[in-house]
Amino acid sequence: PEKKEYLPVVSEEKRIFIERPDALQSAVRMGMLSLDRNHPDYLKFRVLVTLFGGYFGSRLMSNIREEKGYTYGISAGVMPYPGQGVLAVNAETANEFVKPLIAEVYPERDRLQNDLVPAEELSMVQNYMSGEMCRSYESAFSLADAWIFVQISGLRDSYFTDALDAVKNVTPEEIRELAGKHLCKEKLKEVVSGKKMS
């Protein structure tokens, strides 16, 4: 039988609300179509997304959790499905904080598009990502799984070396350029599931 392609479907709506009248908290998801692993920008884009919301010291965590106190945790990540990736921001928050939480995501995106990331902050993310990659492939079994992944995904044999090089060598200027190209505010959809607030 012929293999079917299943790609994410994009809603025309900017905001989607799913009411749960008895919910004590709301689940917030913001997302857009993004890059897959074969895109030439993907490996350095991962560094941008990690800065944005991919680790505990990220921009989103520092602002929305640490400074504003709207949530215990907020994250951003790329799900690189075959043919089409998805960028998603995830958080849970008290119902009354939904709107201010969402509103704070956009200025953090703007900062990445307009300002150069300080060298110290970029270095911290590079060290974090390099360490995570090394820990992920430190056993024979994890290396074997990684090799299988490369083969079934149709990636280059040098994929993991390329990934480490991208993390080590990306510059603040490239981060700003990637944010301008791939973090489009107009394409970012907002989905909330929780109690309706007036």
Residue ranges, per PLM feature:
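A common structural junction motif
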Residues: P1, P107-L116
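Conserved nucleotide- and phosphate/pyrophosphate-binding catalytic cores
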Residues: A91-A94, Y106, E132-M133, Y137
